[in-house]
C-alpha cells in the first residue's frame, strides 16, 4: 500500500493492522478473524483501508465476490471502508471491476481517486467521494501537495467537457 497513507495515519494515532493479499485481493477470511478479535476486546475499527484495483505493490485486483464480502464484513462490524482506487484507471485489456462504493448500498464507503495516474502525474490531484456525514469529518485532514489554481481550473474544464472521452 501507499506508504504516505501509513505515515499520515500513524501521525493521527491510528493503529494499523495489515491483512495479507491473495491472488484475488485481500484475504477476507483473515480480515474476518481480525475484526472478530477486535470486537472481542471492544474495539471498533475506524475503517478498513484497501486498494482493491491494482493493489500496490502486488498489482492484484480484488474479485467482485471479495468486494461484496468486504461490504458484508464492514456492515457486520460497523466499520467504514476507505477504498483507495487511484490505480483503477490503469486497467488495460480487461474489464474493470465495479468499485466497492458502487456495490455498497449502506453508504459506508469512502472512495478515493486520483487524476495523477490517469491524466497527468504533474497535476498531483486526487478526490474523495463520500456522504456528507463522513466527508465533513475528513475535510480537516486534507492536504495540498502544491498544485496550483490554474492546473486545478484546467483539470476542471477538461473533466466537465472531455473526461469520459479520455476513459
Model segments located where?
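PLP-dependent aminotransferase class I/II
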Residues: 110-167
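Catalytic cores of nucleotide-enabled group-transfer and carboxylate-activating enzymes in metabolic
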Residues: 98-99
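Substrate-binding/gating loop at the entrance of the active-site cleft, primarily
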Residues: 1-14
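Helix C-cap/helix->beta junction micro-motif
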Residues: 12, 76-77, 107
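Active-site phosphate-binding strand-loop segment of PLP-dependent enzymes
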Residues: 26-92
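Hydrophobic residues in well-ordered beta-strands that form the structural core
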Residues: 18, 81-83, 155
Amino acid at each position: 500500500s501507499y506508504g504516505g497513507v501509513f505515515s499520515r495515519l500513524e501521525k493521527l494515532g491510528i493503529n494499523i493492522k495489515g491483512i495479507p493479499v491473495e491472488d484475488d485481493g485481500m484475504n477476507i477470511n483473515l480480515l474476518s478473524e481480525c475484526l472478530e478479535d477486535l470486537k472481542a476486546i471492544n474495539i471498533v475499527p475506524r475503517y478498513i483501508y484497501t486498494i482493491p484495483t491494482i493493489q500496490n505493490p502486488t498489482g492484484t485486483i480484488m474479485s467482485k465476490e471479495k468486494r461484496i464480502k468486504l461490504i458484508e464484513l464492514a456492515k457486520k462490524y460497523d466499520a467504514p471502508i476507505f477504498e483507495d482506487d487511484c490505480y483503477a484507471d490503469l486497467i488495460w485489456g480487461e474489464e474493470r471491476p465495479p468499485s466497492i462504493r458502487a456495490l455498497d448500498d449502506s453508504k459506508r464507503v469512502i472512495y478515493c481517486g486520483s487524476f495523477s495516474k490517469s491524466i497527468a502525474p504533474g497535476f498531483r490531484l486526487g478526490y474523495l467521494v463520500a456522504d456528507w456525514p463522513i466527508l465533513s469529518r475528513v475535510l480537516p485532514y486534507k492536504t495540498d501537495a502544491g498544485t496550483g489554481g490554474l492546473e486545478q481550473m484546467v483539470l476542471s474544464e477538461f473533466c466537465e467537457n472531455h473526461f469520459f472521452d479520455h476513459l
